[in-house]
């Protein structure tokens, strides 16, 4: 096991000595004496700090400046990391009473008039307090940064996101889509404008559409064009309120009354027929003849189907009887071959060969 490296150095001077404040005398509580009862000799001046070059000369140092981006050293560098700890320290300093004595007083020290701590108290500090005073003094040096307004300390800067991008986007959108007042609506019961007056309206719409055109990249799909409203009146509406052939037909019949007797072409209205006329009688006779013919054809097809079924049934019975006859002959031949001896079978096979 290697021993830990300890370095001998003079006691660290208080922070107030670097800010041109009167040097503080070493507290007698650090040596186990009550306050105000120390030796009579004057306090020794603080020792001059040793040059930094003589500290840890035998240790190895690494230069990491090559690995750090120089652009990262700005006023906001590591500000977010120390924000929380400094806020806690400021909150503690603000919570302390205004005349609450000094940072080096122990909690049980009596308080005199005006909030000042009585030096030494009536009975002195508790035993053993002087042994821990040195470590306590070293650990309470941090609040001096807050008590003394040091000019070298920078104020805490909170990083905020830039908002110039939002303003630039708004300006760009305003340049792409300028406000265009809508054209005044036409008065009611107005006739459609003639052809020579409709051209400026169309040019205005084309110009308006050209101003609001979006510039897309080659990879994006092109949106469908916006339909331009026509200045001409809408077509006639049909029976259901929709434009269609029915509405146009009604308008045509209204303008030409002589078309009503003709049935209206493709309309669903039935034609009025006189049942006592010869034409109606001839038509009914032709229809009856066609119906009789279709019925006779259906009956004939039915009779033909029945005859075909009878023929197929008779053929099936005849084939079944033939199969039964052949099966009986086969059984008879098998019985004959079983009764013959094997020698005769061999001779018969030899004669056949």
Curated annotation (Swiss-Prot):
**Positions of the UniProt region annotated as Required to functionally cooperate with SREBF1 in promoter activation:** 180-194
Report the residues modified as N6-acetyllysine.
159
GO terms of molecular function: DNA binding; DNA-binding transcription activator activity, RNA polymerase II-specific; DNA-binding transcription factor activity, RNA polymerase II-specific; protein homodimerization activity; RNA polymerase II cis-regulatory region sequence-specific DNA binding; transcription cis-regulatory region binding
Pfam family, any one = bZIP_2
Locate the region Basic motif: 281-308
Its Gene Ontology cellular component terms are: nucleus
Going by the UniProt record, its keywords in alphabetical order are: Acetylation, Activator, Developmental protein, DNA-binding, Isopeptide bond, Nucleus, Phosphoprotein, Transcription, Transcription regulation, Ubl conjugation
Recorded superkingdom? Eukaryota
Q: Which GO terms describe its biological process?
A: DNA-templated transcription; fat cell differentiation; glucose homeostasis; granulocyte differentiation; lipid homeostasis; liver development; lung development; myeloid cell differentiation
Q: Where is the bZIP domain?
A: 277-340
Residue span of region Required to repress E2F1:TFDP1-mediated transcription, to inhibit cell cycle and to induce adipocyte differentiation:
1-70
Instruction: Give me the ranges of the annotated region Required for interaction with TRIB1.
Output: 54-72
Query: Which residues, renumbered to this chain, carry the PTM Phosphothreonine?
Result: 222, 226
- Cross-link (Glycyl lysine isopeptide (Lys-Gly) (interchain with G-Cter in SUMO2)) at residue(s): 159
**Which positions bear Phosphoserine?**
230
Pinpoint the Glycyl lysine isopeptide (Lys-Gly) (interchain with G-Cter in SUMO) cross-link.
159
Q: Where is this region: Interaction with FOXO1?
A: 240-353
Q: List the residue ranges of the region (Required to induce adipocyte differentiation).
A: 126-200
Family (UniProt): Belongs to the bZIP family. C/EBP subfamily.
Q: How does it assemble?
A: Binds DNA as a homodimer and as a heterodimer. Can form stable heterodimers with CEBPB, CEBPD, CEBPE and CEBPG. Interacts with PRDM16. Interacts with UBN1. Interacts with ZNF638; this interaction increases transcriptional activation. Interacts with the complex TFDP2:E2F1; the interaction prevents CEBPA binding to target gene promoters and represses its transcriptional activity. Interacts with RB1. Interacts (when phosphorylated at Ser-190) with CDK2, CDK4, E2F4 and SMARCA2. Interacts with SREBPF1.
Any domain commentary?
A: The recognition sequence (54-72) is required for interaction with TRIB1.
Name of this protein = CCAAT/enhancer-binding protein alpha
Q: Which organism is it from?
A: Bos taurus (Bovine)
């Amino acid at each position: 096991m290697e021993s830990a490296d300890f370095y001998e150095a003079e006691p660290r001077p208080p922070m107030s000595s670097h800010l041109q404040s009167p040097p503080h005398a070493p507290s007698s509580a650090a040596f186990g004496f009550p306050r105000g009862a120390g030796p009579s000799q004057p306090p020794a001046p603080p020792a001059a700090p040793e040059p930094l070059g003589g500290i840890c000369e035998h240790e190895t140092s690494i230069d990491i400046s090559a690995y750090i981006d120089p652009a990262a050293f700005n006023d906001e560098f590591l500000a977010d990391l120390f924000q929380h700890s400094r806020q806690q320290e400021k909150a503690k300093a603000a919570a302390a009473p205004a005349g609450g004595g000094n940072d080096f007083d122990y909690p049980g020290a009596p308080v005199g008039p005006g909030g000042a701590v009585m030096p030494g108290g009536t009975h002195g500090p508790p035993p053993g307090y002087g042994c821990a005073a040195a470590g306590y003094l070293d650990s309470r040096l941090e609040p001096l940064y807050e008590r003394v307004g040091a000019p070298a300390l920078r104020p805490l800067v909170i990083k905020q996101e830039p908002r110039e991008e939002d303003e630039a986007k708004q300006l760009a959108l305003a340049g792409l889509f300028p406000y265009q007042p809508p054209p005044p609506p036409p008065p009611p019961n107005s006739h459609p404008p003639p052809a020579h007056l409709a051209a400026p309206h169309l040019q205005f719409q084309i110009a308006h559409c050209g101003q609001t055109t979006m510039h897309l990249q080659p990879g994006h799909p092109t949106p469908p064009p916006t339909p331009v409203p026509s200045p001409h009146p809408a077509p006639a509406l049909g029976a259901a309120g929709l434009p269609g052939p029915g509405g146009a037909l009604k308008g045509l019949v209204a303008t030409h009354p002589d078309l009503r007797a003709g049935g209206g072409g493709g309309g669903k209205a039935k034609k009025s027929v006189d049942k006592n006329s010869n034409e109606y009688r001839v038509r009914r006779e032709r229809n009856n003849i066609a119906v009789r013919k279709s019925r006779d054809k259906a009956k004939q097809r039915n009779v033909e189907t029945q005859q075909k079924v009878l023929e197929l049934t008779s053929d099936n019975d005849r084939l079944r009887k033939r199969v039964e006859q052949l099966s009986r002959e086969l059984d008879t031949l098998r019985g004959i071959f079983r009764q013959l001896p094997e020698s005769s079978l061999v001779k018969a096979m030899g004669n056949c060969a």
